[in-house]
Swiss-Prot record, chain A:
Modified residues (O-(phosphoribosyl dephospho-coenzyme A)serine): 14
Coiled coil start-end: none
UniProt record similarity statement: Belongs to the CitD family.
Subunit structure, as described in the record: Oligomer with a subunit composition of (alpha,beta,gamma)6.
Top-level lineage group: Bacteria
Protein name per UniProt: Citrate lyase acyl carrier protein
GO CC annotations, alphabetized: cytoplasm
Entries under HAMAP family matching the protein: CitD
Parts of the chain that traverse the membrane: none
UniProt keyword Cytoplasm, yes or no: yes
Record keywords: Cytoplasm, Phosphoprotein
Functional description taken from the UniProt entry: Covalent carrier of the coenzyme of citrate lyase.
Subcellular location: Cytoplasm
Gene: citD
Length: 97, 512
């Protein structure tokens, strides 16, 4: 799936993550800022990438500002950002969820 | 070699610095030799010096050990002014031996390390930019971290030999009688500084408030003081202590506090004449409030409260629920003011408070203590020194010392953000699990299996689920996932002494 527009979901409150998706053409490129990057950086990138793959998004620039979010939060924020970026926010892709 | 809590202590450090590896929390009854400082005799007529530069030029030489206290906390002005003068004079190779380092001192210490002025540090702790710099290998020699009681011990036994102590005081007369209670920069107890005043080769008081001779009550006495320096400002009163202490509204902290209170009141130690120490954290303050109600309901009064004092503890004193406060430092203005006005609030020095090599310290008489933790592991070992990223950001404070109480409770949330507090192995062991009796989290408690008696008495409290510590660790991991192990280099950046002076752990340089 092609990203139609730059979209954002989430906040920078503690225990949240802010995901910004924009067009890319070189796979999924995650730029992660996180206080727990050393311990959980790989896991955070994996959750974001896996979630985007379920939307069949294969090219995207992802800016992720993490404030200690758990996996379920990361997944939820990524789904929302992806729905918005694909202009699908009114037609939720339930199969992906 | 591996010490008794399983930490690898490099052999060269044990050998070169003549250290023993940690073995036991038992102190026993050894004979200990104390040291006494050289005294330069004077009649007291010419002690006043008008500038920091003049006193530094007169007293500080390359290679010396200098000390400060941290009673002025984040409002401290003295440390930065004195260190700047020392750097300006090009003095090198000093050992910095303060009672602790606060954030307001960080940038100056980093600067002094970079200029070669400071080459060794011993402290209770460090945080922020300084902790980060040290963890990244800025200092060639490892920092030595000691608890408040251990610092007192090391000074008394000559392990820390202070050449010049620079002690900021909110008042002094011209001959050096001073206390911490009066003046713009009043902070209450001088507990930690009293060690320096008693044992340093040269004692320099710095004050912005010269008062008529003789100044009483004198916590630091003219018999101990070499010079009195008049300065423009000792500290910023607004930042010395936090203002009015606010009770937490955080439901997680309140839940923890409630359970801590249940543990205390169901323990055999909760009886008339018991004693306790609480810290200054949100949950600890809330415990004081619950404990007050429990004391009223059960008509129980405490004989004394110990340690760092806050206004809620002072309120208990005024209400007659606590008979005495034994005060080594004051965390807020209410506590500091009270020391001036209430004879039942006794100033105590760090040795009286917590020195293990003593003819009894106050902590030896302590029944119940509530302490915090950055991490606690399945062996009940506690880390209050390094963060989850391995970087130094804490202080031992009185943790190891107070943990010798009859009932030592660690109050901590199961997780903080994505970081588990209950872990398989703490990053750095500060207080050994042998000292810890109960862990209280928001989901329930874990009792150290070595305490068979407590397993029995605390296992059936309504609303207080009991888990094994392994179960709590698993619960934490289910929430946050399994973190990747931290990476460190081979370089040792800090040594963690146990309160008896043995090595309980070392901190390695973080790999980035």
């Amino acid at each position: 799936m092609e990203i139609k527009k730059t979209a954002l979901a989430g906040t920078t409150e503690s225990s949240d993550i802010q995901i910004t998706l924009s067009k890319g053409n070189d796979g999924i490129d995650v730029d992660l800022t996180s206080d727990v990057k050393k311990q959980f950086g790989d896991q955070i990138v994996k959750v974001i990438t896996d979630t985007l793959n379920k939307f069949q998004i294969t090219n995207a620039k992802v800016r992720a500002v993490d404030k200690g979010a758990l996996d379920c939060v990361i997944k939820a924020r990524t789904i929302t950002a992806a729905s918005r970026a694909l202009n699908q926010e009114d037609q939720i892709n339930w199969e992906v969820l | 070699m591996k010490n008794r809590v399983g930490r690898e202590i490099p052999d060269d450090i044990l050998k070169d610095k003549n250290y023993k590896a940690f073995e036991t929390t038992e102190i026993g009854h050894p004979d200990k030799q104390r040291v006494a400082p050289i005294v330069t005799v004077t009649n007291g007529d010419n002690k006043v010096v008008n500038s920091i530069k003049e006193i530094v030029e007169k007293l500080v030489k390359d290679g010396m050990t200098i000390s400060f206290h941290h009673h002025l906390r984040e409002g401290d002005q003295i440390f930065n002014d004195v260190m700047q003068a020392i750097i300006d004079l090009g003095i090198k190779d000093l050992t910095l031996a303060p009672s602790s380092l606060t954030n307001v001192m960080n940038d100056m210490v980093v600067k002094a390390i970079k200029s070669g002025t400071i080459t060794n540090i011993t402290s209770s702790g460090m945080r922020g930019s300084l902790g980060d710099a040290v963890s990244h290998g800025l200092l060639k020699n490892p920092v030595v971290f000691r608890s408040h009681g251990n610092r007192a011990r090391a000074i008394e036994e000559g392990k820390i030999k202070i050449d010049v102590a620079f002690l900021g005081v909110p008042n002094s007369d011209e001959v050096g009688n001073a206390n911490g209670m009066e003046g713009d920069a009043a902070f209450g107890s001088l507990g930690y500084a009293l060690m320096d005043a008693q044992y340093a080769r040269r004692v320099v008081l710095l004050t912005d408030n010269l008062v008529p001779y003789p100044n009483t009550p004198a916590s630091i006495k003219q018999t101990q003081v070499d010079y009195v320096v008049k300065v423009a400002k000792v500290g910023d009163p607004d930042r010395i202590g936090s203002g009015a202490t606010r009770f937490t509204k955080d439901p997680k902290e309140l839940k923890i506090a409630q359970m801590v209170n249940e543990v205390i009141t169901h323990s055999p130690y909760f009886k008339d004449g018991f004693s306790f120490q609480t810290g200054s954290g949100g949950a600890a303050l809330a415990v004081t409030r619950y404990l007050r109600q429990a004391m009223l309901d059960n008509k129980i009064k405490a004989s004394f409260a110990l340690g760092g004092i806050t206004k809620p503890t002072v309120d208990l004193l005024e209400e007659g629920l606590v008979n005495k406060i034994m005060d080594v430092q004051d965390f807020d203005k209410g506590a500091a003011d009270s020391m001036k006005n209430n004879r039942k609030q006794q100033e105590i020095d760090a040795s009286w408070y917590a020195d293990p090599d003593n003819k009894a310290a106050m902590v030896d008489q302590l029944d119940v203590v509530i302490l915090s933790a950055l991490e606690i592991d399945t062996k009940f070992n506690v880390n209050v020194m390094t963060g989850s990223d391995g970087v130094i950001r804490g202080a031992i404070g009185g943790h190891q010392d107070a943990a010798t109480a009859k009932l030592t409770i660690i109050s901590a949330p199961l997780v903080r953000g994505r970081i588990a507090t209950v872990v398989p192995d703490v990053t750095t062991i500060v207080t050994p699990g042998d000292s810890i009796d109960v862990l209280v989290t928001e989901v329930g408690i874990a009792i150290n299996p070595k305490r068979h008696d407590l397993l029995e008495t605390l296992s059936n409290i309504p609303g207080v689920p009991v888990y094994t510590i392994e179960e709590l660790q698993q619960k934490a991991q289910q929430i946050v996932g399994k973190p990747k192990a931290l990476e460190f280099t081979d370089k040792t950046v800090a040594l963690i002494e146990y309160r008896d002076g043995s090595l309980i752990d070392v901190v390695k340089q973080v790999k980035d």
